[in-house]
Design a protein with these regions (language model features):
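Short, conserved beta-strand element in jelly-roll/cupin
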Residues: 129-131, 141-156
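A short, N-terminal "cap"/entry segment at the start of jelly-roll beta-barrel domains
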Residues: 23-120, 209-219
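Bacterial N-terminal signal peptides that target proteins for export
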Residues: 2-11
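Short histidine-centered beta-strand/loop micro-motifs
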Residues: 135-141, 158, 183-184
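Short acidic-glycine-tyrosine-enriched beta hairpin
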Residues: 64-71, 159-179
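Bacterial N-terminal signal peptides
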Residues: 10-21
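Ligand-binding loop in jelly-roll beta-barrel domains
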Residues: 84-89, 175-203
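Extracytoplasmic
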Residues: 120-125, 190
Length: 219
């Protein structure tokens, strides 16, 4: 028979482990740095950029491609970031509507993005490659998320319903705050550039264990 003191110690250890596990889960990143890449499929962080305060005009995500990094870097403005992703060199810029860099090929202008005047922002850029059926766990962002989909289809469920982003279709922009659950749908591999434009004082992504999706993206 186990002595009461031993049982109490075991229960206490178990409680601490569960508490630690819950705390760790709340800050588990959905995406990993590209330096930790172990395969093609997944979500990989290509850059974390400081943006600072934004103009009071409507703000957009500008996407331009260049033949090489050497050509993209001189065109980069104060809110621009050059990344190599999905086999191309991209200049990704947070700016007002109608902004254009020197050279390159204009790919997309996504927005307007929901922003808060006076807030200091950071931009996390990612490369997402999901096979059909792959999901990202429930999570939330302290700022807007947007995708530029090159191939495939993605369904995103939030408490307000679902939205679908497809290559060649309307761009997906999700305001910060609400929890979300992402599923790669359709029959093609999803390849996308992803932006999280977030409050620079907060982590870009946190888990959302307090919310359970209804499975709307399975229908």
């Amino acid at each position: 028979m186990t002595p009461p003191s031993t049982r109490r110690l075991s229960i206490g250890i178990a409680f601490v482990l569960v508490t630690l596990s819950a705390c760790e889960k709340a800050f588990v990143p959905v995406c990993k740095p590209v330096s930790e890449r172990t395969g093609e499929a997944g979500c990989w962080i290509t850059s974390d950029a400081t943006i600072g305060q934004l103009p009071s005009q409507p703000i957009f995500w500008h996407i331009d491609s260049y033949p090489s990094r050497a050509e993209a870097e001189p065109a980069k403005g104060p809110r621009g970031t050059v990344v190599e992703s999905l086999g191309k060199v991209w200049l990704l810029t947070i700016e007002i509507a109608g902004w254009r860099p020197a050279g390159g090929d204009r790919v997309a202008e996504i927005g307007p993005l929901p922003v808060t005047p006076g807030l200091s922002y950071a931009a996390q850029y990612m490369e997402a490659i999901f096979t059909p059926g792959m999901t990202a766990p429930a999570h939330r962002h302290p700022g807007s998320e947007a995708w530029y989909t090159l191939t495939g289809e993605t369904c995103l469920e939030t408490p307000d319903g679902k939205m679908v982003g497809r290559a060649g279709g309307a761009h997906v922009i999700v305001p910060g705050g609400p929890p979300m659950h992402l599923t790669a749908t359709g029959t093609e591999i999803r390849r996308a550039l992803v932006l999280i434009l977030h409050d620079s004082t907060k982590p870009p992504t946190t888990a959302a264990p307090d919310w359970t999706p209804k499975g709307l993206c399975r229908n």
